[in-house]
């Protein structure tokens, strides 16, 4: 059972070599397909130099052009990856961002053996204290965002609404499910669930997302970029209690100023 790995990459020169080292060590990769978006640094040069010596099959494509602000995220890339997958013979697809670090060598095997339609490990921010979950905008459970400092902590794989950043899908789930903006990962999961497929998260498996703040890079909600009202979805904690959007700023202060997780 082979796995196609899809990687969107842009402005990643400063940390790309670290990611590529982890990718090389990951077992079960049959082919790695990169979609490169125009970058002012030497991301493309770094990627091409690595590809010449890489111990796996590597393909590099130019990112599809942006047609409008609403298409500014990576849905067009996913659509092209779906076509590449259809033309190949891989049984599974792994989507992973190029700023994911500390990837277990056996990640693909660990995800694949669970035989789920769509499944993801937990994604944490590298070196962040207190321990911080990376992307609650796409990781959702019971209609709520994962709490960043106290996400659901079930002891085994559990069914969720959506996942992102790093996830695996079977060939059928990936190629036969519509993907769209503004949150491609989330819309993919929602569309998959609408077709009767199931989406899962495994808290026993972890990868770490680069802490981009030291590089001066900050996540900006897509709603802000698109001029839409903010997403006021609340957060769910490990004990299933809910934290509303108005309470979260105080919890961020407790975490990052005082180093404690609010109860």
PLM features per residue range, with description:
Residues 21-30:
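Short, acidic, metal-binding catalytic loop of nucleotide-sugar glycosyltransferases
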Residues 7-21, 38, 69:
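Active-site beta-to-alpha loop of glycosyltransferases that engages the nucleotide-sugar donor
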Residues 76-92:
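Active-site nucleotide-sugar/metal-binding loop of Leloir-type enzymes
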Residues 90-101:
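Short beta-strand-to-loop acidic/aromatic patch adjacent to the donor-nucleotide binding site
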Residues 101-179:
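Conserved catalytic core of nucleotide-sugar-dependent glycosyltransferases
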Residues 35-47, 51, 64-66, 100:
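A conserved acidic beta->alpha catalytic loop
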Residues 2-4, 187:
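Cell-envelope/extracellular polymer assembly enzymes that use nucleotide-activated donors
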Residues 155-157, 161-166, 171-256:
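C-terminal catalytic/acceptor-binding lobe
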């Amino acid at each position: 059972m082979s796995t196609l790995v899809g990687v969107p990459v842009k402005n990643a020169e400063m940390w790309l070599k670290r990611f590529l080292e982890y990718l090389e060590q990951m077992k079960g990769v049959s082919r790695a397909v990169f979609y490169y978006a125009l970058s002012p640094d030497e991301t493309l040069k770094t990627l091409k130099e690595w590809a010449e010596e890489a111990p796996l099959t590597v393909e590099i494509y130019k990112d599809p052009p942006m047609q409008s602000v609403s298409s500014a995220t990576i849905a067009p890339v996913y659509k092209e990856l779906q076509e590449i997958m259809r033309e190949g013979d891989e049984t599974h697809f792994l989507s992973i961002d190029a700023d994911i670090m500390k990837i277990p060598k056996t990640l693909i095997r660990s995800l694949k053996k669970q035989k789920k339609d769509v499944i993801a490990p937990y994604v944490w921010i590298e070196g962040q204290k207190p321990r911080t979950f990376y992307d609650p905008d796409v990781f959702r459970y019971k209609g709520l965002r994962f709490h960043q400092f106290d996400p659901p902590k079930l002891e085994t794989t559990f069914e969720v609404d959506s996942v992102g950043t790093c996830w695996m899908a079977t060939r059928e789930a990936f190629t036969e499910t519509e993907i769209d903006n503004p949150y491609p990962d989330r819309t993919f999961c929602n569309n998959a669930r609408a077709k009767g497929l199931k989406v899962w998260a495994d808290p026993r498996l972890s990868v770490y997302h680069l802490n981009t703040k030291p590089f001066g890079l900050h996540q900006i909600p897509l709603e802000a970029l698109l001029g839409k009202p903010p997403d006021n979805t609340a957060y769910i904690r490990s004990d299933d209690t809910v934290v509303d959007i108005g309470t979260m700023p105080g919890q961020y202060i407790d975490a990052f100023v005082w180093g404690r997780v609010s109860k």
